[in-house]
Amino acid sequence: MKKKANARTVAKYIFLAATIVICVGLCVGSLLPGETSAATSDNFGGAVEGVLDDIGVSTGDVMDGTGFTDWQLFVRKLFGHFGAFMFLGAVASVTFMLFSKDSTRSRLAAFGMAAVFGFSFACLTELLQTDLFTTGRGASFDDVITDCRGYFITCLLFFAVWFAAIILKHVAAKRRYGALLSSAAADEYERDPSAQDKA
């Protein structure tokens, strides 16, 4: 039991550190000047395009049905917003789970805080792109929505699996407890002649 508690404590702070690192990285990316950010996206987009060419897939096929016609913009939205926040959603969700207590109220609070954190951080990263903090960029609520879509896909998935596992564990425990009570009652019945006479 003590080893399990120690492992949970270590995991808590590992995931907390990972969440902080990801958040710092996203904030730094948001603070990049427009020219630097565009150049970084272009380089990354070119690298992805090269990989697709090697396997015989065109960028047009990838963007088909997405509403995008600009490959660099598509890559920026997919990886810089949706994908990055999807990864953050997974790590942050586990962090909130690990810091929750063993009660329904605490677990629901963890989910609520994870949801508020995801939306708030998406808004913050867009705020950092305004002229108050950097140059050549601008905030977009559409990007906040894209960020939240990525974040909440993994957040909802992880919490759904977590809650389902807890419910199944409780159901299994009740069944085991019921089986033990039935077994104990049967043993008592066999040992008590008066109970058998009454039956």
Predicted regions span which residues?
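Bulky hydrophobic segments
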Residues: 1-136, 148-199
